[in-house]
């Protein structure tokens, strides 16, 4: 309920701010209001639809097998561990799935805390000790308990709305400026679309940096939550184990942001969804 209230308050503040800016710039409030409504429908609507379909997309993209009846002792242990952590975290039991992949990875997704999905790769099960797998599960359960998927989707939706609205408004300003010169031709339909799409791409890059910054913050928070559901030592051991492998994530792009990502360099660091393993271990050791 708090998250929904915060979301509504945020959008109200955005509407008031944009209304003030439009008044100061002397823009037509009626056309701007219609554009803002369209941007909100596409920006926020697209983000929420993606969230609603996230479990289905994740299962299809990874070929994950949801454990309903355990086929072996490992699957039985996974269900038991997740059930215990869910009870400790005060959330509903999520679906637990395993997907085929050589790399050690895991992710959590879902629209509601009480109806989420936790999936681990076969590579993670083979490559980690039971204590380390328990810590990884605790990390993913912390994401669910913290409502990270919903929070990031709301942030993405607000930024999507900004990107669509500002790119169209900037294209309108350019078109009006060109229409007022001696030729008076303006951009034309295709020119307007090309400029707005280019601006959307540029603004979208900056929006992605903001989303990824929030994502990195949520990773530290989930690591901290894992220390309460498992232990600090187990979480550090799991991250140290990941350092020993050359991480090359096989997760499909649709769910890559939810899993463990290889380290990149330069400007690519701004687009990372996860902090470096070194930074995460250092943060845990400082607790």
From Swiss-Prot:
Class of the enzyme per the UniProt entry, highest EC level: hydrolase
HAMAP family in UniProt: Pept_M48_protease_HtpX
Topology in membrane: Multi-pass membrane protein
Active site, UniProt feature: 140
A biological process from GO: proteolysis
Record: residues binding Zn(2+): 139, 143, 219
Keyword Zinc tagged: yes
One Gene Ontology cellular component annotation held by this UniProt entry: plasma membrane
CDD domains referenced in this protein's UniProt entry, alphabetically: M48B_HtpX_like (cd07335)
Annotated GO MF terms: metalloendopeptidase activity; zinc ion binding
Residues annotated as transmembrane: 4-24, 35-53, 147-167, 194-214
Family to which this protein belongs: Belongs to the peptidase M48B family.
Protein name as catalogued: Protease HtpX homolog
Cofactor binding mode and count: Binds 1 zinc ion per subunit.
Compartments where found: Cell inner membrane
Keyword Metal-binding: yes
UniProt cross-references to Gene3D superfamilies, sorted A to Z: Metalloproteases ('zincins'), catalytic domain (3.30.2010.10)
Keywords: Cell inner membrane, Cell membrane, Hydrolase, Membrane, Metal-binding, Metalloprotease, Protease, Transmembrane, Transmembrane helix, Zinc
Superkingdom of source: Bacteria
Known cofactor(s): Zn(2+)
EC numbers, comma separated: 3.4.24.-
